[in-house]
Amino acid sequence: MSAEKKYVVALDQGTTSSRAIVFDQDANIVGTSQREFTQHYPKAGWVEHDPMEIWATQSSVFTEVLAKTGLRSEEIAAIGITNQRETTVVWEKATGKPIYNAIVWQCRRTAAICEELKARGLEEYVRENTGLVLDAYFSGTKVKWILDNVEGAREKAMNGELLFGTIDTWLVWKMTNGEVHVTDPTNASRTMLYNIRDLKWDEKMLDELGIPLSMLPEVKPSSEVYGYTTRGGGSRIPIAGIAGDQQSALFGQLCFEKGMAKNTYGTGCFLLMNTGTEPVRSSNGLLTTVAIGPKGEVNYALEGAVFMGGATVQWLRDELKLIHDARDTDYFASKVGDTNGVYLVPAFVGLGAPYWDPYARGTMVGLTRGANRNHIIRAALESIAYQSRDVLDAMQQDSGIKLAALKVDGGAVANDFLMQFQSDMMHTPVVRPTRIETTAMGAAFLAGLAVGFWKSSDELEDKFSVDREFIPQMSHEERNKLYHGWQKAVERSRRWAEED
């Protein structure tokens, strides 16, 4: 490797913004650039993005970050891509023009298609072979919808004139001027079209959904040189890493070993546990998905999502007006020794794993005349930790692995009260890294390893530093008593919106 190749760039294409982050050889951030883009809601429950706007924002932040840092393309060793998963783009092979907006992972328009597939008895097949639940969340039914609803699309697809990709595939196609049509196993495993056991596109699912194989990208390892771009002006830069956002965060947290887990605390919480080289089937409603091993090879993970994490704090701020800033919660929660018996179950949109109850609704129980603002704020923070424990307990049950420590990232990890309570509630150390940009770091690591910028995953271990480790301090009796109260509160919230 030439001595002047001093940096790796991660392109982090998210649900609301596109970012570019430059890392040096010590995994320090040298520069960042970010641009938001438009969310389109054409009907209730529908969510779309303009693929050309995604490309424009992602391309411009890359150019911007080089300009801001004064770096030349010759100094960039490689580019890694991490992306919002499941979001679906279909475009014309000849022109590179999308035939419809990108259908976003949050979009519910294909729920009826999923119900039809369930009626045809496909639920068990999907679970067993793709690791997923039959839901509108995943890409497969979104592709079918586009082929069924865009005029002439199905005919063009059958003639080999259309291409499909998740956002990673779309970006690589654009960056290589249409030369490379590729994805990685982590993104492929979120399409409902990929067999996670055989590690290839699943012909039965393609047949059931009427999707020709010719539309699909080639699946290549998450750490490999896929092609080159001249977007930075000047020399060709290798595009050498791809991973879906949550798997990228797992890799960025160096969760390479079986049983290692991370929790990303954002609007919701995403928990992933590496289960090693064999897929583990969940009996608790968790997803089985592809993760990445230390050499970029396929590993597997269990994944569970908590719908309301940071969103619960936003509710305290925006609707109840109990706080002015999310950062205030640490202060108010620490002013009282406990919640005075108050539990908040933030089932505002139902409950996710392991309950899967769309009819659950937000509930506050245990209120007495002595309950005050501090107790309610504390109960809201505690609810994030309780829900995370629900998922982690399910993971430990499914995998038979006792968690040694939980690595954490995302905005809410700055809240010391929440991190300590999380550790207490799970009776497990919680490890907060110094650098919390772990999603982008994962993509940078994958790209850097592919081109020899970093020699091995062992070298990456030296780049990982811990800001603080939270050690459990709560007694066994106290923890059990509090968690039992939470379970009772959850029961009160369940099936609330069901029609009598």
Swiss-Prot record:
Q: What GO MF terms are annotated?
A: ATP binding; glycerol kinase activity
| Activity regulation information from UniProt | Inhibited by fructose 1,6-bisphosphate (FBP).
Superkingdom of this protein's organism: Bacteria
Question: For glycerol, which residues are the binding ones?
Answer: 85-86, 137, 245-246
- Broadest EC class assigned to this enzyme: transferase
Entry binding sites for sn-glycerol 3-phosphate? 15, 85-86, 137, 245
Q: Which UniProt keywords apply?
A: ATP-binding, Glycerol metabolism, Kinase, Nucleotide-binding, Transferase
Q: Does the keyword Nucleotide-binding apply?
A: yes
Catalyzes what?
glycerol + ATP = sn-glycerol 3-phosphate + ADP + H(+)
Q: Biological process GO terms, please? A: glycerol catabolic process; glycerol metabolic process; glycerol-3-phosphate metabolic process
Which annotated residues bind ADP? 15, 19, 267, 310, 411, 415
**Pathway it works in:** Polyol metabolism; glycerol degradation via glycerol kinase pathway; sn-glycerol 3-phosphate from glycerol: step 1/1
Question: At which positions is ATP bound?
Answer: 15-17, 267, 310, 314, 411
Q: Name one GO cellular component term.
A: cytosol
Q: Recorded E.C. number(s)?
A: 2.7.1.30
What HAMAP family has UniProt attached to this entry? Glycerol_kin (MF_00186)
Please state which protein family the record places this protein in: Belongs to the FGGY kinase family.
What is the protein's known function?
Key enzyme in the regulation of glycerol uptake and metabolism. Catalyzes the phosphorylation of glycerol to yield sn-glycerol 3-phosphate.
Protein name (record): Glycerol kinase
Source organism per UniProt: Aeromonas salmonicida (strain A449)
